[in-house]
Amino acid sequence: MRTWACLLLLGCGYLANALAEEAEIPREVIERLAHSQIHSIRDLQRLLEIDSVGAEEPLETSLRAHGGHGAKHALEKRPVPIRRKRSIEEAIPAVCKTRTVIYEIPRSQVDPTSANFLIWPPCVEVKRCTGCCNTSSVKCQPSRVHHRNVKVAKVEYFRKKAKLKEVQVRLEEHLECTCTSASPSPDHREEEAGRRRESGKKRKRKRLKPT
């Protein structure tokens, strides 16, 4: 009975020690990662002030850790493989930037009142902000956008005859991107002069007539 109690105490102590070692990542570390430029594992290592990068455990060490005569005997019988140095390619991050994506033109942009028509071309290429940021606390979002109008063909059928009409569709292009918080709505700076003029106008205050 005393032996079982000792084993239970040892197990609880080991579990507490393991939980203490696997601490939660500090908030300041997440913030530092979110607002830093990281292009490689070496940059990440330098930013977190880590002296060395851990490697995978060798086969001999793994078998030795499990112990026992059976593991040693299996290692002796196993043919020794010819070790070849393989250069493993480092993962290239998909950074937050503008990329060409396929945009399917919504039917509501062409004619929201009808459903019996075709659009050509149905898809176009636009520049949009894509990619990942260093942490999930920030998202890749546009910081500067531009709108342009393009012509598409709207094809309808009347009395078994095709009728084609050109319709203007407004497309949004992303010019610059940034990693920012996902909750607040981004303040896009429009490229169109008309919108800048409208935003620059001051509202006139109405004077109240004395009663």
From Swiss-Prot:
Swiss-Prot/TrEMBL GO biological process terms: angiogenesis; negative chemotaxis; negative regulation of phosphatidylinositol biosynthetic process; negative regulation of platelet activation; platelet-derived growth factor receptor signaling pathway; positive regulation of cell division; positive regulation of cell migration; positive regulation of cell population proliferation
Compositional bias of kind Basic and acidic residues: 186-197
List of glycosylated residues: 134
Keywords from the UniProt entry: Cleavage on pair of basic residues, Developmental protein, Disulfide bond, Glycoprotein, Growth factor, Mitogen, Secreted, Signal
Compositionally skewed regions (Basic residues) per UniProt: 198-211
Annotated SMART domains: PDGF (SM00141)
Spans annotated as Receptor binding site: 158-162
GO CC list: cell surface; extracellular space; membrane
Compartment(s): Secreted
Family per record: Belongs to the PDGF/VEGF growth factor family.
PANTHER family recorded: PLATELET-DERIVED GROWTH FACTOR, PLATELET-DERIVED GROWTH FACTOR SUBUNIT A
Name the record gives this protein: Platelet-derived growth factor subunit A
Annotated gene: PDGFA
